[in-house]
Design a protein with these regions (language model features):
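Nucleotidyltransferase catalytic core that binds NTPs
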Residues: 1-153
Length: 153
């Protein structure tokens, strides 16, 4: 079984995340969305809220499951038997950053491959960081996040 992990904070999930996930599904038998718990960052949305949002967005997709994890992402890959890690790439700087991480991950656990999926042009400017800033300033984020997630804000 080809299992992939799509890790992130998803704080909140965006249409760009959804696009990358949907485009990756034909490549794998199962994709685990891994919500990483980062002790150095204060989250905007609770972990439960993020799980609910992701489950609502993908409730009709049997190949996707949502889990949380702490620690090294490659160790979580091993725990869930994922041989692949999906990463979305928006910009050249994303690529440079993700390439460095992928190389470090490969040094730690050589059997886990990083799969880069380039975002569609319409989604390349969307990031959770920008969406959070808009939310903090009472702006309208409807065009940037899936409606199922928006309904849970």
């Amino acid at each position: 079984m080809k299992i992939a992990l799509f890790p992130g904070s998803f704080d909140p999930v965006t249409k760009a995340h959804v696009d990358i996930l949907k485009r990756s599904l034909p490549l794998f038998d199962k994709v685990v969305i891994g919500i990483g718990l980062n002790s150095t960052k204060a989250p905007f949305l609770s972990i439960d809220k993020r799980k609910k949002m992701l489950r609502a967005v993908f409730e009709n997709e049997s190949k996707i499951e949502v889990q949380t994890y702490e620690g090294l992402t490659v160790e979580f890959c091993k725990k869930i038997n994922a041989s692949y890690m999906i990463r979305g790439i928006r910009t050249v700087s994303d690529f440079e950053y993700e390439k460095a991480i992928a190389q470090m991950n490969h040094a730690l656990v050589p059997e886990i491959e990083s799969i880069f999926i380039v975002s569609k042009p319409g989604y390349s400017s969307i990031s959770s960081t920008i969406v959070r800033d808009i939310l903090r300033n009472n702006g309208d984020v409807k065009q940037f996040i899936p409606k199922e997630a928006f309904e849970l804000l």
